Amino acid sequence: MGKYFGTDGFRGEANENLTADHAYKIGRFLGWYYGEQKRRNGDDTPARIVIGKDTRRSSYMFEYTLVGGLVASGADAYLLHVTTTPSVAYVARTDNFDCGIMISASHNPYYDNGIKLINGNGEKMDEETIALVEDYLDGKVEVFGETYEEVPYAHKDRIGCTVDYVAGRNRYVGYLISLGMYSFKGVKVGLDCANGSAWNIAKAVFDALGAKTYVINAEPDGTNINNNAGSTHIEGLQKLVVEKGLDVGFAYDGDADRCLCVDEKGNVITGDHILYIYGCYMKERGKLLTNTVVTTVMSNFGLYKAFDEQGIGYAKTAVGDKYVYEYMAKNGCRIGGEQSGHIIFSKYASTGDGILTSLKMMEVMLAKKMPMSELAAPLKIYPQVLENVRVTDKKAAQSDSDVQKAVAAVTEKLGDTGRILVRESGTEPVIRVMVEAPDQEICQKYVDEVVNVICEKGYKA
């Protein structure tokens, strides 16, 4: 992680930690950098950069300032308008863009926003390029073996163009529809669009495949994104599924790069369940390449026991679908993801894609002719307590010797009956303390022991 960019982009409260000036400078640098890179390789055409945004009020402000920076540096800016993060990755990859930018703070409240950078292969941006962007934000331009006083402006006909590119978003919708292996006719599906990016995409896909679709939280007003809605507030979808007698429900977050499910009984199906269900489905069909499902350190203890019972191997990465994808690409794995619902199907996408995930869960249900509750039943989730402690200095809190002693003491007490994980958030000034054990009370007790030490040492904000 850098000074500005965390595991999922540059994120903060709009016009506090993340300002319009930041966005303009990011546009200025990227527009020049990719254009100069092309010129040095004998290509005199302008850089082409595609931009998407979610439904936050501030997303429009950041879009306009990013575009201003891009075209001032000579790049052409292609606007997908309100769309999902995975659609930006798809369009960047398939339409040969130099890079993509998504304006979103994902599951955060409306007053936050973020800038996510995506390379021309549709993958999260590499650390080297992000470091160059951060240097420019701090007034330093050292690139291509040279030092510049400032990124040069484009002039006359070298000033970039702005292109309405809603056609790119529409092609992404068509791509999702093309992945439907079965007709959804007769299946009653609930969708919670979080008043975010999925609001004008998810229903179109499910309707095209024949589902009887019931939608909630698809009326964005700029301030209601993720407000008691979507994958972080799934109780509304649970109620809808039960009251309407639906077969399944899917909840997305603000930029629709994650998905959680609700089975026909109203139970929540987490990202760990999805990894288990699809991993078993792939193994049964002989398509689980390397016989490995990629998880993160936050996946439930019970998931690994279930994989062991099924003879499925697994890998653990740091938290962040960026790290999951890097491992998958390096090792040839087909399925990986996070408990939170960021799931990557590497045959079809290079990032987590919530709508794609829901289509794949529909595929398993229809192929096996089983309800979601039965597909998920073999996975026994261990009780888990996770507490997010907002701190003044997360690195100091994490490395404090007394905190580490408290963690070691809990680890010893749990033995092989559970685990404790204490880590820094990649996107917030937060320490996450998580315990899994056979009993909820034990989990809470051990979480409290560690959190109390963090507070006693004065780290709590």
Predicted regions and their residues:
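Proline/glycine-rich low-complexity loops and linkers
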Residues: 131-173, 178, 264-337, 344-345
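An N-terminal, well-structured beta->alpha segment
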Residues: 1-68, 72-73, 162-187, 395-399
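Buried hydrophobic positions in well-ordered alpha/beta secondary-structure cores of metabolic enzymes
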Residues: 8, 51, 88, 101, ...
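General beta-strand structural signal in soluble alpha/beta enzymes
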Residues: 5-6, 51, 77-82, 102-103, ...
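Gly/Ser/Thr-enriched, mixed-charge loops and adjacent short helices
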Residues: 13, 113-244
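Phosphate-binding and adjacent anionic-ligand microenvironments
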Residues: 248, 285-461
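N-terminal small/polar loop signature for handling phosphorylated ligands or for N-terminal nucleophile
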Residues: 40, 48-112, 204-262
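Gly/Ser/Thr-rich active-site loops/lids in small-molecule metabolic enzymes
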Residues: 124-126, 215, 267-286, 354-364, ...
